[in-house]
Curated annotation (Swiss-Prot):
Native species: Dictyostelium discoideum
Protein name: Putative uncharacterized transmembrane protein DDB_G0281883
Biased composition (Low complexity): 103-130
Record-level GO cellular component terms: membrane
Bias-annotated ranges (Acidic residues): 167-185
Keywords for the protein's UniProt record, in alphabetical order: Membrane, Transmembrane, Transmembrane helix
Region (Disordered): 102-130, 159-185
Cell compartments where the protein resides: Membrane
Length: 234
């Protein structure tokens, strides 16, 4: 009886550890991918004016690359709300880490597993707890990912960047004839005006198929590893 209980305890410890490992690594890699996405966005998307002016409009239309986010900003109240939610989620992760390090038999805060009542139902309860943990792990993970993605939802530009862009545009536009130059200025003014009137954009994945693909690949990789480790205890 004691040996069975000890084995069940060891199983629960390992299950709790792998649940925490899966959630933590998925969130961490999501944050890293988000940073790479911001760099990609800033280098390739925000510099579209320079590319179009050099190529003399022999390129796809601007609407394909328009993000609609150049003049969009988040209010302070919304930022505080996101930071608060993010802090709460990080506290959940820290508490989970402490539980795993102290080797407690209780489940993680987001696993909602019940304690084992008797030795006869120990195996069935442990399997049900693991399945509940597997199914409910995604809700807290997705909330953490969402808070990280929306925490800094806009790309902020420094004055020096905007100045250099305008200087480059003025130099490159000198190569155009007067008609194409006036057309370019009119279209850019209209686009910036329409962007400033747009509401706050919370969907961070508006036109980034690369970002979506990277998230899916990472999620599948860690989910496969997580399931493979969990099957050892079944």
């Amino acid at each position: 009886m004691k040996k069975k209980k000890e084995k069940e305890k060891e199983k629960q410890k390992s299950i709790n550890y792998y649940i925490f490992f899966f959630q933590y690594t998925l969130v961490y890699n999501t944050i890293q991918i988000n940073k790479i996405y911001k760099l990609f966005y800033h280098v390739f998307i925000t510099k579209k004016k320079n590319y179009f002016s050099k190529s003399n409009y022999n390129s796809p239309p601007k609407s394909v690359f328009s993000s609609g986010r150049e003049n969009v900003y988040l209010p302070e109240e919304y930022k505080k709300k996101i930071e608060k939610e993010n802090q709460e989620n990080l506290e959940i992760l820290e508490n989970s880490m402490k539980d795993a390090s102290h080797s407690k038999t209780t489940s993680l805060p987001f696993s909602s597993s019940s304690p084992q009542s008797s030795s006869s139902s120990s195996s069935s309860s442990s399997s049900s707890n693991s399945s509940l943990s597997c199914s409910l792990i995604f809700s807290s993970t997705l909330s953490l990912i969402k808070s990280e993605l929306i925490k800094d939802d806009t790309i902020k530009y420094s004055e020096s960047d905007s100045k250099s862009d305008s200087e480059f545009d003025s130099e490159s536009n000198s190569d155009f004839d007067s008609e194409s130059e006036s057309e370019y200025e009119y279209e850019y003014e209209y686009e910036s005006k329409s962007n400033s009137e747009q509401p706050i954009i919370n969907n961070y994945l508006d036109h980034t198929y690369i970002y979506n693909f990277a998230i899916v690949v990472k999620a599948i990789h860690y989910l496969h590893h997580f399931i493979k480790e969990m099957l050892k205890f079944v």
